[in-house]
Amino acid sequence: MKQWVAVLLFVLPVAVRAQDQSSIVSFVNERTINAPIADLWRVWSTSEGYKAVGVTLADVDLRVGGLIRARYGADGTLGDAQTIENEILAFEPLRMIAIRIHKTPANFPFKEAWKQTWTVLTLTPLADGRTHVRAASLGYGTDAESVAMRRFFERGNEETLDRVAAHVERRESR
């Protein structure tokens, strides 16, 4: 028994440090959007809705293990070398979707850093009909490539939330 206690006393601080490290190298983008939760859920859960994030082509296979395939340029087709694929890790309808990059576009500059990352998008309905959107990006390392990729996605996620807000708020005003 004393041996197990000694092992746990050694292992637990290492596990806690690992958790602390992952929270240090992760980031969150948040926004309250003037639209009901159902409108925002459609953005991330349907092929047509996903185009609101700024892509030209999209295909969403909403299931655990399904892919969200997207292409920013109209000069190709889904599945070509410039398609980005995100794997759906988990989802709770109208509340949460967790994804990780499955395949990057051929010209994606961060060749290794993406392999350990994932994102959890959480939607929270507010009493006044608006929705709080929270995108937690996790698994980023401290190496130079990971730091650069983090900066890229911090800005990119803000721009995505801007586009989504403009899209759903425009629909609401009709």
Predicted regions and their residues:
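Beta-strand/loop substructures that line and gate deep hydrophobic ligand-binding cavities in soluble
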Residues: F108-R155
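Positively charged n-region of N-terminal signal peptides that target proteins for export
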Residues: M1-W4
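Hydrophobic/aromatic beta-strand elements that line small-molecule binding cavities or substrate pockets
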Residues: N29-R31, L57, T83-A90, Q116-P125
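A short, structured loop/turn motif at beta-sheet edges
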Residues: N34-A38, L62, L89-I97, T122-H132, ...
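Hydrophobic pocket/interface hotspot
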Residues: L40-W41, Y50, I68-A70, I88, ...
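Short beta-edge strand/loop motif at the mouth of beta-sheet-based domains
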Residues: E48-T83, F91
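Hydrophobic ligand-binding cavity/cleft-lining segments
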Residues: V16-D59, R63
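Hydrophobic h-region of N-terminal signal peptides that target proteins for export
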Residues: L8-R17
